[in-house]
């Protein structure tokens, strides 16, 4: 500044003047006033300092609002970006695992929970898109156990890859047996081939047969199971005794034969009890006996007792076939077999301890006496009453169910007899000769002096036809009650394993061993 008070151009530039003029409120500034120049000179520096401090303070204060003010500005200018922020979906996965765990227990509801978890109104649509597939997966979850069960039953293939033909084959009935197979061979060993024909169902009836040699056990079992009298005996499921075998005096069946029908009825045909042909085979062929038996006839009797005791334990019905009335040794044998019969296995838990005496829990089958090859006079009512009375007296002390389950009077075999004709009716059934049908169909012709009318009448038989009696016997046997063999309900396969265990126990029975020592 010069002495005259004029400002030098170098010191006061255009910017200085602008900076001095800018803060003014308006109008020219008075520079000639007292103290005006000091204000003009000092105030600008202070103003610069103040401006610098204000600029720094405003810059610091403006940085934070600028950063915070940018998102609202962008949100106002660009509405689509609300969906763009990827930061909000980040917490969503943290909540989704919690939401996904709940539908597994509650079933439905993942869509509603995800919709409620979104705070904004526009946000639910985006998560709603992935929610449906998750809901579908959760909806399929309850059906997974069904597919697992099908996989176990149908194989290892996936449910979608299952062949419908295979599933339909499972519903078909089992293969029909065409002939009997061995359950116990001639060496008295158990055979496991019969289990292939058994199912896992409990509605099964087991019928066994006992009888002396040549009484027609195999023929009766074949007629009851699958064959008819008109068929050739060589095609029977249980092979009957051939003419050559009859001439030699031998037995056709050895061990125990097994056959099951489509109606799930098991038939067990056995070798003859107390058979002389088996005894002759042991003696003449020098067959070695087990060490516990010293004499051949003792071994034959023990074999017969083992088979009878086995049938009394695993059968619902046991048919005793005889071809004449009657053999007292047969009834003595039945009482002995009942004595050595193995007891019913007790349950694992002692819940049946309050059932009463041991006789109440012990199992005994139905016993049917079948008089095969009956003659005409055997069908006489007076003779019929005598037979019933004698059997009742011989079996009076037996626990076997030998009465009250089969009746010839109720099936109309004797239409003229009242139901109370027999005082004590036992399970007795009469079947005539099978060959008598051919004789009755071809009666002898009348002589030349007789009336031709008699030649047209059928011959008198004195009893119903063979086919009719076999049909009545079959219907009564198959309609018998099926008591529980053990303390638990057995399926067909369970019965097979139960029978195998019983047979092993019979072979090792201490009661039979003690009885064999008494016979020796």
UniProtKB/Swiss-Prot annotation:
Residues 1-94, 108-143, 341-360 are annotated as: Disordered. The modification Phosphoserine is found at residues 2, 4, 7, 32, 53, 451. Residues 342-357 have a biased composition (Low complexity). Residues 36-53 have a biased composition (Basic and acidic residues). InterPro entries: P-loop_NTPase, SMG9. The modification N-acetylserine is found at residue 2. This is Nonsense-mediated mRNA decay factor SMG9. Keywords: Acetylation, Intellectual disability, Nonsense-mediated mRNA decay, Phosphoprotein. It comes from Homo sapiens (Human). Phosphorylated by SMG1. One of its GO terms (biological process) is heart development. Involved in nonsense-mediated decay (NMD) of mRNAs containing premature stop codons. Is recruited by release factors to stalled ribosomes together with SMG1 and SMG8 (forming the SMG1C protein kinase complex) and, in the SMG1C complex, is required for the efficient association between SMG1 and SMG8. Plays a role in brain, heart, and eye development. Belongs to the SMG9 family. One of its GO terms (cellular component) is cytosol. Changing residue 184 to A: In NEDITPO; uncertain significance. GO terms for molecular function: identical protein binding. The keyword Phosphoprotein applies. Self-associates to form homodimers and forms heterodimers with SMG8; these assembly forms may represent SMG1C intermediate forms. Component of the SMG1C complex composed of SMG1, SMG8 and SMG9. Interacts with DHX34; the interaction is RNA-independent. It is linked to Heart and brain malformation syndrome: An autosomal recessive syndrome characterized by multiple congenital anomalies such as cardiac defects, brain malformations, including cerebellar vermis hypoplasia, hypoplastic corpus callosum and Dandy-Walker malformation, profoundly delayed psychomotor development, microphthalmia, and facial dysmorphism. Residues 78-94, 122-133 have a biased composition (Pro residues). The lineage of its organism: Eukaryota, Metazoa, Chordata, Craniata, Vertebrata.
């Amino acid at each position: 500044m010069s002495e005259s008070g004029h400002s030098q151009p170098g010191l006061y530039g255009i910017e200085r003047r602008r900076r001095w003029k800018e803060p003014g409120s308006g109008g020219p500034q008075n520079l000639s006033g007292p103290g005006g120049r000091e204000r003009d000179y000092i105030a600008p520096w202070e103003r610069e300092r103040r401006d610098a401090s204000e600029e720094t303070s405003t810059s610091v204060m403006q940085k934070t609002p600028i950063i915070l003010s940018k998102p609202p500005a962008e949100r106002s200018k660009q509405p689509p970006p609300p969906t763009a922020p990827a930061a909000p979906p980040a917490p969503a996965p943290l909540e989704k695992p919690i939401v996904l765990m709940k539908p597994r227990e509650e079933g439905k509801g993942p869509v509603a929970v995800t919709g409620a978890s979104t705070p904004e109104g526009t946000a639910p649509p985006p998560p709603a898109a992935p929610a449906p597939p998750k809901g579908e997966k959760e909806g399929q979850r309850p059906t997974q156990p069904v597919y697992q069960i099908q996989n176990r039953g149908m194989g290892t293939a996936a449910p979608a890859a299952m062949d419908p033909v295979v599933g339909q084959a499972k519903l078909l009935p089992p293969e029909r047996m065409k002939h009997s197979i061995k359950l116990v061979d001639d060496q008295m060993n158990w055979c496991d081939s019969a289990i292939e024909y058994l199912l896992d169902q409990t509605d099964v009836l087991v019928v066994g047969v006992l009888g002396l040699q040549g009484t027609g056990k195999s023929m009766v079992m074949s007629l009851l199971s699958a064959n008819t009298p008109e068929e050739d005996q060589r095609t029977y499921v249980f092979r009957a005794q051939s003419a050559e075998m009859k001439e030699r005096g031998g037995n056709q069946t050895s061990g125990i034969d097994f056959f099951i029908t489509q109606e799930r009825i098991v038939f067990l045909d056995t070798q003859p009890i107390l058979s002389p042909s088996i005894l002759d085979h042991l003696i003449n062929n020098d067959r070695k006996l087990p060490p516990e038996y010293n004499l051949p006839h003792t071994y034959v009797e023990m074999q017969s007792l083992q088979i009878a005791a086995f049938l009394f334990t695993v059968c619902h019905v046991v048919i005793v076939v005889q071809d004449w009335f009657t053999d007292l040794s047969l009834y003595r044998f039945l009482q002995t077999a009942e004595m050595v019969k193995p007891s019913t296995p007790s349950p694992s838990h002692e819940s049946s301890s309050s059932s009463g005496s041991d006789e109440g829990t012990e199992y005994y089958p139905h016993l049917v006496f079948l008089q095969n090859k009956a003659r005409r006079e055997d069908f006489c009512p007076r003779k019929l009453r005598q037979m019933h009375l004698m059997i009742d007296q011989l079996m009076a002390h037996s626990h076997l169910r030998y009465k009250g389950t089969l009746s010839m009077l109720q099936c109309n075999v004797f239409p003229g007899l009242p139901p109370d004709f027999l005082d004590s009716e036992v399970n007795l059934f009469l079947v005539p000769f099978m060959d008598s049908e051919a004789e009755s169909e071809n009666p002898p012709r009348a002589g030349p002096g007789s009336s031709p009318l008699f030649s047209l009448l059928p011959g008198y038989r004195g009893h119903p036809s063979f086919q009719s009696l076999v049909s009545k016997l079959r219907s009564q046997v198959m309609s018998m009650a099926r008591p529980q063999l053990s303390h638990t309900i057995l399926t067909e396969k369970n019965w097979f394993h139960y029978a195998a265990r019983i047979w092993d126990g019979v072979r090792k029975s201490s009661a039979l061993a003690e009885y064999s020592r008494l016979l020796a």
